[in-house]
Amino acid sequence: DINLVWDFFVDIYERGNGGVPAPFFEYAIQSSWMDTTYQYLDRLWLDGDKVVGFVFNESPVTDVYFKIRPGYEFLAKEMVDYAIEYMPNFDNKQQFMLFNGQEIFMEEAKKRGFRQIYDYEDRQFDFKNKLDFVLPEGFHFVNPSDVEPVKLARCCWYGFDHGDKGPFENWEARDDYSDWTPQKSYKGILGAVMSPSPHSTCQYDVIIADEEGEYACYSGMWWVPENKLAYMEPLCTIPKYRKMGLASAALSRHYKTMKPLGAT
């Protein structure tokens, strides 16, 4: 069903409105950090062959998301009822992740006793502006086609602050743990390199290495031409190279690559 979901998200995409874009879902389900145990509970609503609604979870599994096609808002009540009854709610931690343009879901949630507990800003860059941060001396860009999975997994391990769990080692060992491990980090990267998800555009990823070849910064890129959307996910810099402008240089590289393709 991945193509059904992707096409649905792309078809109803509206910048800054209506929920997460297509890469959000596909990036999550192909990632080794994602608990897919309860993915069978994700549900599509169809009108004939046309997808008109979707309820799904991400990480943690108690975070529930909604997507609905304009004109089918009458399904919101049914979708919320389904989420409450069937989607994971361990330790009463189920929460609905709602966005601008999803007021109909907010209203239905409030009727059932939900209340807003926090909000956050979804950052977007307008390509009418310009990004032109220079790569610091001593670093260089790595061609995405030449990526070394072990180096990239190590970058993500430390870049996402997992170093407190231990050093990045024994990455090829058997992984018998539910916690995040070097094995899971490596498995996720290796899988994405060897067998990319259907709509992956890893050829636009940005990888920055130091003079010794250690990967210092990684910025993934999902290009959705139908939406003119350049979706950056993920982004990390290893601790010893933070606050040096590497992420800014990576985003500038994305800008110079994606703007000529039509990104807005």
Please state what every model-predicted region is:
Residues 73-85, 237-239, 243-260:
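Conserved acetyl-CoA-binding loop-helix of GNAT-fold acetyltransferases
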Residues 46-48, 125, 209-211:
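Active-site beta-strand termini and strand-to-loop segments that position acidic
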Residues 152, 217-219, 228-233, 241-245, ...:
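Extended hydrophobic-aromatic, low-complexity segments
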Residues 10-87, 216-230, 238:
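Conserved donor-binding loop and adjoining core beta-sheet/short helix segment
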Residues 20-32, 57-61, 163-235:
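A conserved beta-strand-loop-helix scaffold within acyl/acetyltransferase catalytic domains
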Residues 1-27, 134-184:
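Short amphipathic alpha-helix that is part of the acyltransferase structural core
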Residues 40, 91-92, 260-263:
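Short, high-confidence coil segments that cap the C-terminus of an alpha-helix
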Residues 58-63, 68-138:
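Acyl-donor-binding surface of acyltransferase catalytic domains
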